[in-house]
Amino acid sequence: MTSCHIAEEHIQKVAIFGGTHGNELTGVFLVKHWLENGAEIQRTGLEVKPFITNPRAVKKCTRYIDCDLNRIFDLENLGKKMSEDLPYEVRRAQEINHLFGPKDSEDSYDIIFDLHNTTSNMGCTLILEDSRNNFLIQMFHYIKTSLAPLPCYVYLIEHPSLKYATTRSIAKYPVGIEVGPQPQGVLRADILDQMRKMIKHALDFIHHFNEGKEFPPCAIEVYKIIEKVDYPRDENGEIAAIIHPNLQDQDWKPLHPGDPMFLTLDGKTIPLGGDCTVYPVFVNEAAYYEKKEAFAKTTKLTLNAKSIRCCLH
């Protein structure tokens, strides 16, 4: 018999989150649709729960009410004593943790798909938090293969000092899905179709896995975050240069030392320094102006996964 890495157990509980950011409308629209008619997301033997994560922000069509829901799922915020004085999103995070967690427990949901849009030209993107997770690498390989020839990129946010504390991190297997470009507060049919297909293929993978299909060893190309880059700023902290036209919409493309990065209003080009080629992502993302992030630098690498098969009882 072929030796293989056996994944822990079959997958039982899956959640699909929309509206973690209330103005990213593809996930909101799909989740609302699936709450009314969820036939397309159901798979035999699998509990799939669509869920609106930040209903107040969705109602106002804004990213958040008090603070970013997708950055506060750490033990400090989840452990705060519940009171009306807490920011709305912290209270909501505790409610979500109660419903789908608790985080880092045996009772937490197996998989959470968190649906997002970006204003950046990132196409279909899967966000991975753990480079050693054979199950998710296999799932992402399946999704990428199923979507081809449509490109699907994998963004690895594993980093020693950049801690995200994402909404989906309460699950055993957290999956971020990011599709763009799409303006905030807008629905685009092409973007919706791409996100819908990503979810379909992900659920198909889980179904095949649960039925005992063995997935042979595989490898995927990923883009691992190195650092986030702020806009150049003046002495008052105001933005002093904008994304250069040569960099705009060039997510995932190589940016070499000396290539144009920013452009000042008086026409001066600010190039990339250093001696390493990087791959920019979230270029000129609207939501990241407040976070002082013009783009993120990534490096390209390959992740390998062992063969996996479900432990059938």
From Swiss-Prot:
Changing residue 170 to T: In CAND; 5.5% residual enzyme activity. It is found in: Cytoplasm; Nucleus. GO terms for biological process: acetate metabolic process; aspartate metabolic process. This is Aspartoacylase. The record marks 63 as: Transition state stabilizer. Changing residue 129 to K: In CAND; <1% residual enzyme activity. The keyword Secreted does not apply. Changing residue 178 to A: Reduces activity by 99%. It is linked to Canavan disease: A rare neurodegenerative condition of infancy or childhood characterized by white matter vacuolization and demyelination that gives rise to a spongy appearance. The clinical features are onset in early infancy, atonia of neck muscles, hypotonia, hyperextension of legs and flexion of arms, blindness, severe mental defect, megalocephaly, and death by 18 months on the average. Belongs to the AspA/AstE family. Aspartoacylase subfamily. Its EC number is 3.5.1.15. Changing residue 30 to P: In CAND; <1% residual enzyme activity. CDD domains: M14_ASPA. Catalyzes the deacetylation of N-acetylaspartic acid (NAA) to produce acetate and L-aspartate. NAA occurs in high concentration in brain and its hydrolysis NAA plays a significant part in the maintenance of intact white matter. In other tissues it acts as a scavenger of NAA from body fluids. It comes from Homo sapiens. Its cofactor is Zn(2+). GO terms for cellular component: cytosol; nucleus. Zn(2+) binds at residues 21, 24, 116.
